[in-house]
């Protein structure tokens, strides 16, 4: 209940501050909202983000650029199931199109893509090694079960609870390690 109350208090404080916002702050927030909407539309429908961004008034572009980058960067994550999310490539292209320093953003994009490739390679290698390690002992386990049940049994390494537990543990450590690297790269991209 204390958390709910404190969250409510925070919301009330924010509403109070918002009520006292200057005209400049309201205008900046309006531009940020426009930027967020451009990014969402770009991710949803594709389209020409550069043209949409260029159509904004010059005064709006600074705030909108920051908001666009924030939305696009939120769509760049480590692949959870071993495959890249197709929206990630689109988000990277969008970042490149709104960057103030195109060359630096291009370098960061290449670095980020390398991080993602390294993550997938380490993940896949570890999965195969773990599978081979458990596979070595599965034959003996399978024979013991067949003797116990008096029928043929087919065991899949990936379905063993011990394998799944080991894999979850390793994957959690791997995600922690690569998330920090990815976040540092995304911070750099936000500033470009």
Regions found by a protein language model. Give the residues of each.
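Alpha-helical oligomerization segments
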Residues: 148-192
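Leu/Val/Ala/Ile-rich N-terminal alpha-helices, chiefly Sec-type signal peptides and the beginnings
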Residues: 1-60
């Amino acid at each position: 209940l204390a958390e709910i109350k404190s969250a409510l208090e925070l919301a009330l404080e924010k509403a109070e501050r918002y009520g006292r916002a200057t005209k400049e702050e309201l205008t900046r927030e309006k531009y940020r909202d426009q930027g967020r909407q451009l990014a969402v539309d770009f991710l949803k429908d594709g389209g020409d983000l550069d043209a949409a961004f260029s159509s904004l008034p010059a005064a709006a572009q600074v705030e909108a650029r920051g908001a666009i980058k924030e939305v696009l960067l939120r769509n760049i994550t480590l692949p959870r199931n071993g495959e890249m999310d197709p929206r990630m490539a689109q988000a990277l292209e969008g970042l490149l199109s709104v960057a103030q320093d195109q060359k630096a953003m291009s370098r960061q994009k290449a670095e980020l893509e390398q991080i993602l490739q390294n993550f997938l390679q380490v993940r896949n290698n570890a999965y195969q090694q773990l599978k081979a390690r458990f596979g070595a002992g599965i034959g003996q386990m399978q024979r013991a079960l067949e003797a116990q049940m008096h029928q043929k049994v087919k065991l899949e390494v990936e379905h063993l609870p011990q394998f799944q537990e080991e894999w979850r543990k390793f994957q959690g450590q791997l995600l922690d390690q690569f998330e920090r690297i990815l976040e540092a790269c995304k911070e750099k991209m936000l500033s470009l």
